[in-house]
Amino acid sequence: MNEKARLLRIRAKLKRKKPRFLRQEWWRYPKFKNDPKWRRPKGIDSKMRLKKKGKPRSPSIGWSSPKAVRGLHPSGYEEVLVHNVKELEAIDPTRQAARIAGTVGARKREMILARAKELGVKVLNP
């Protein structure tokens, strides 16, 4: 069994259990509901800061994924954003995969896809 594949399976299992980390009392104010993101609770009497039972969870180092596979695509490849054919040719097909930028048009996208097939580079959004 490949070590990288094993760590990717562990990461997937950890991600299923990980809660959504949202700011304190995000349900109370509409301005927080529309833009959910983490902000550390800093209030002097904050139950969430004190990690009281029944209060939302806070992010900590224990929730992180294994360091060797952190930031990788679920397929195990490192993502590289590609804007043109020249950038595609710099990719190592054994450990990197291309993601074509959203600003690339249809004609250039076809050129990139054709060249990727020749080079054997995996494209994540064909």
UniProtKB/Swiss-Prot annotation:
PROSITE patterns with a match to the protein in the record: RIBOSOMAL_L32E
Keyword Ribosomal protein: yes
Keywords of the record: Ribonucleoprotein, Ribosomal protein
CC per GO annotation: cytosolic large ribosomal subunit
Pfam hit, one: Ribosomal_L32e
Superkingdom per UniProt: Archaea
Subunit structure: Part of the 50S ribosomal subunit.
Record family assignment: Belongs to the eukaryotic ribosomal protein eL32 family.
Protein name (database record): Large ribosomal subunit protein eL32
